[in-house]
A protein has these predicted regions:
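N-terminal cationic and glycine-rich segments that engage phosphates or anionic surfaces
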Residues: 1-105, 110-450
């Protein structure tokens, strides 16, 4: 406790870090306040049925969690940040196939800015498609016509589309500003704060269900909390675990502050078991809405009914099989993008370092690629198992669905991953200013090895 108090005092003493944290908290507060602002012309009291259904889990529960309740509230942020996530998926997938995007990726900062601009425009396009679908879909979700105070007129639809698109763009802007001037990844923090906002209600509903319905009582609640803590610890291990590649140096003339300098200090290259972080989960979850949507296009046909029945139930067999497969695929895909083994090999060669038994240059790059493939496969399976664990606990012990979403799956992994990433950034600021960090001996040394 004394160490935590000392760390808080240290954070307060560092002006830049203090301002970054306050800036982040302020923008997160703006986002949460916006999630409570209902679209003009919509009666919030008439949305109670949609809100209660979304609290019970299912696709509605995930949508509502990702938007922090904005989806069920028909808020100006009802679309949340998911259109931006979807746009990022498309751009990164196209970056593998389109020469133009591949060229931009190699142009450094200027290319990154152009890719960001393309992602923004694609986000707007997705918003324009999703906004009317959301407005017309409210009736299918059980919202009565009386909820629309002035009726669902063309003027109301047009105005609401503009507001929803603007809300998504504003949320995207908030996320980018947090990343640039705050602490942590802004987009991930927006999703996390929305998920955390739904946690107390989900736990309360599960507690009431266990006690009032004689469904295990407090003993079962205690067991669930114990299992939850174990899953959190396993998730932390997944995020933090690294494979250490030993490095030897023939000479030590590395430039201070560079990646090669850091390698020289620690005498090994740390390759993370889950180098892609939470992004495979977010990407896979974004695509999991597609099968049910495609099924609705086919209407009452056999294919349409099967798609809607199989992929609208997030605790069902087919949904979780596809979800797990997508998590594995995106883990490999995103790791290939985010781990620049060629650059690591070049930096190592320039600093006079080499992996024992491996020639510097291309052979080292191929070796690092091989090791990454070896550790990414079990890491992706580990990630997929945790991702589908909510469905397992629902089927095995009959847990309340809204609370089960926090037993692994998208919600827990995002919260754990974002929390660790944010803590590591705060830790880096503290260590750079010669204060004791949040981790005993630095973020890299505290990681478990495999």
């Amino acid at each position: 406790m004394n160490k935590l108090i000392d760390v808080i005092k240290s954070i307060y003493k560092i002006k830049e870090l203090r301002e970054r944290i306050l800036f982040t908290l302020a923008l997160l507060l703006v986002y949460r306040l916006g999630a409570q602002v209902v679209l003009p012309g919509v009666d919030s009291l008439a949305l109670s049925d949609l809100s209660s259904r979304s609290d019970g889990g299912g696709l509605l529960g995930i949508l509502n969690a990702f938007t922090g309740g904005a989806f069920a509230n028909a808020s100006i942020f009802a679309l949340g940040i998911m259109p931006y996530i979807s746009a990022s998926i498309v751009v990164q997938l196209m970056g593998v196939a389109l020469p133009y995007l591949q060229k931009l990726q190699k142009e450094g900062e200027s290319g990154r800015k152009k890719i960001t601009q393309i992602t923004r425009w694609l986000t707007i396009f997705i918003c324009v498609v999703q906004a009317p679908a959301y407005l017309y879909g409210l009736s299918a979700l059980g919202v009565p016509d009386s909820a629309f105070i002035f009726g669902r007129t063309p003027a109301f639809i047009f105005t609401s589309i503009i507001i929803l698109v603007t809300g998504c763009i504003f949320a995207m802007w908030l996320g980018e500003k947090i990343t640039d001037r705050g602490i942590g990844n802004g987009i991930s923090l927006l999703i996390t704060v929305g998920i955390v906002a739904t946690l107390p209600l989900s736990f309360t509903q599960n507690l009431i269900s266990r006690i009032s319905e004689s469904n295990g009582g407090l003993i079962m609640v205690v067991i669930e909390l114990a299992v939850w803590l174990v899953i959190i610890l396993l998730s932390i291990l997944l995020v933090m675990a690294v494979r250490q590649i030993p490095v030897q140096y023939a000479r030590r003339n590395s430039v201070p502050g560079t990646q090669s300098s850091e390698m020289a200090k620690r005498q090994y290259i740390p390759l993370k078991l889950n180098a892609s972080g939470v992004m495979p989960i977010i990407f896979a979850q974004a695509l999991m809405f597609a099968p049910a949507t495609i099924g609705s296009v086919f209407g009452t046909s056999a294919v349409g009914q099967w798609l809607q029945a199989s992929f609208s139930d997030i605790f069902g067999l087919w949904y979780n099989i596809l979800f797990g497969v997508l998590v594995v695929i995106f883990t490999f895909f995103y790791t290939a993008i985010t781990v620049p083994t060629n650059k690591m090999s070049d930096d190592l060669k320039r600093s006079g370092g080499f992996v024992p038994g491996i020639r510097p240059g291309n052979e080292t790059s191929e070796y690092l690629d091989s090791v990454m493939s070896q550790i990414t496969f079990p890491g992706s399976l580990y990630l997929a198992i945790i991702a589908v664990f909510p469905a397992i606990v629902v089927q095995l012990i009959g847990m309340q669905q809204g609370w089960a979403l926090f037993f692994g799956g998208t919600s827990l992994l995002i919260m754990v991953g974002v929390a660790i990433d944010t803590i590591q950034q705060v830790n880096a600021h503290l260590l750079n200013n010669h204060y004791d960090g949040l981790m005993k001996s630095g973020s890299m040394r505290s990681k478990p090895t495999i």
